[in-house]
Amino acid sequence: MNRPRPALASAGGLAAAALAALLLGACGGGGEAPTVPGASAPRGRALITYYGCGACHRISGIDQADGRVGPSLEGFAERRYVSGRLAATPASVAQWIVDPQRHLPQTIMPTLGVTPGQARDIVAYLYRQ
């Protein structure tokens, strides 16, 4: 009697399973948070308060940062994308903070006048919380 072979027994099924495992592994978690060379997380924390980021975002370690307009920034190091478009690397997150409208014109996040250096400091804080 011929029994049907399980889907994963075929070479194509095994390749598909391996690809799925690889893609799921890239979705988040695991590994250390990236570092931001030359940036200061304590300065970033102060800048988050100065620019009022907590009015729209929930941010760990920042007093009264319990906004609900924008996404929570808690556990930021686990993110893989910013605004669903940009890879969440320190460089791209800093670019987003400096000029979010450039990357997503319909975003409600305002351009606040944050300099590139300040953005790197903010990113350093977000990745360390």
List where the protein language model places each region.
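Hydrophobic packing within well-folded, soluble alpha/beta domains
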Residues: C53-C56, I122
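C-terminal motif of bacterial Sec signal peptides marking the signal peptidase cleavage site
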Residues: L23-A26
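Detector for the c-type heme attachment site
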Residues: G28-G30, C56-D63, E78, Y127
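Electrostatic cytochrome c docking/interface patches
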Residues: G28-T49
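Bacterial N-terminal signal peptides that target proteins for export
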Residues: N2-A16
